[in-house]
Regions:
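Tandem repeat scaffolds
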Residues: 3-16, 20-292
Length: 292
């Protein structure tokens, strides 16, 4: 049934028709602005903007990159002037423009693609896909990511978002900033098994369900009022240890003096969490860790 739904939602998108609505421009990174697409979105039966089945990899046609960019910058000189404002060297600019005349943007540009949505609330991305390394920097609230295959990193805050049956190309789960009241249910890492939590990120009132985390290290992550019904397994010959304050201090010393004075030293914290169904494999928690 899910496969049929996925095929149906994917078939509803006419990328040739919607590409003229996309703005493409370069700031510090390459930005793909989808505001016009979301403006014209229908709503689901639940009242969400309907982005179900959207394939972010189909945003670009096979036309040369220069054709895509000149829609925004009009001519090459304007493009060169714009790139120089963002610190591009003359050599880098000329090389990029040369490649852009013979290759699509996905081959001529080697950085990360930034997706700009223009909308931040109540979007349903179920059955959507993305193959390229992309980022969404906006804060998102009450969005649905079910049965997705993504290579998206979330830089903004996530609130009330649902990730279910979610296959990711990224090594970390959720936002690399702050996560509040999000559900992570059956998260699967594609290609490799490493799936963990980004250092110095807070998860507030989140649920981690039916997921097998493969942890190489864990530093500075705060879990506040979270529920764990999942497995955490250490990746290594010896058991991985979740560090307390002293262990974290030793770790900073190993990185050099700059790491010691670069911000507060925050050990991993579990504050009022339900760990009754958390399974640990090849992983142990330092005695100094406090379960508040």
């Amino acid at each position: 049934m899910k496969q049929k739904k996925s095929i149906y939602y994917k078939s509803t998108w006419d990328y040739k028709k919607i590409r003229p609505k996309i703005r493409c421009f370069i700031e510090d990174e390459f930005v793909i602005d989808l505001t016009k697409i979301l403006e014209d979105c229908d709503k689901t039966e639940s009242g969400y903007l309907d982005m179900r089945g959207f394939d972010f990899s189909n945003l670009f046609s096979s036309q040369s990159a220069i054709d895509t960019l000149l829609k925004e910058y009009k001519d090459e000189e304007n493009l060169k002037t714009h790139l120089s404002k963002y610190g591009w060297s003359e050599y880098a600019i000329n090389s990029f423009i040369s490649q852009s005349k013979s290759q699509p943007i996905t081959k001529s540009y080697h950085g990360v693609f930034i997706i700009r949505l223009g909308y931040k609330q109540k979007i349903d991305f179920s059955y959507s896909e993305s193959k390229f390394a992309t980022e969404i920097n906006e804060n998102l609230d009450d969005c649905i990511f079910e049965d997705c295959k993504h290579n998206i990193e979330f830089r903004g805050e996530l609130t009330h978002c649902i990730f279910r049956n979610y296959k990711t190309g990224c090594p970390y789960i959720g936002s690399s900033n702050y996560n509040t009241k999000c559900t992570f249910d059956n998260i699967i890492r594609g290609n490799t098994s490493y799936l963990s939590f980004k250092p110095n990120v807070t998860y507030q009132s989140c649920k981690f369900l039916h997921t097998h985390f493969k942890v190489v290290s864990l530093h500075g992550t705060v879990f506040d009022n979270c529920v764990f019904d999942c497995t955490m397994e250490g990746e290594g010959i010896r058991p991985i240890e979740i560090p307390d304050f002293l262990d974290e201090l030793k770790y900073r010393f190993s990185l050099g003096l700059g790491a010691i004075f670069n911000g507060k030293i925050i050990p991993v914290k579990f504050i009022n969490c339900d760990l009754s169904k958390l399974k640990l494999k090849n992983l142990k928690i330092s005695k100094g860790i406090k379960f508040i």
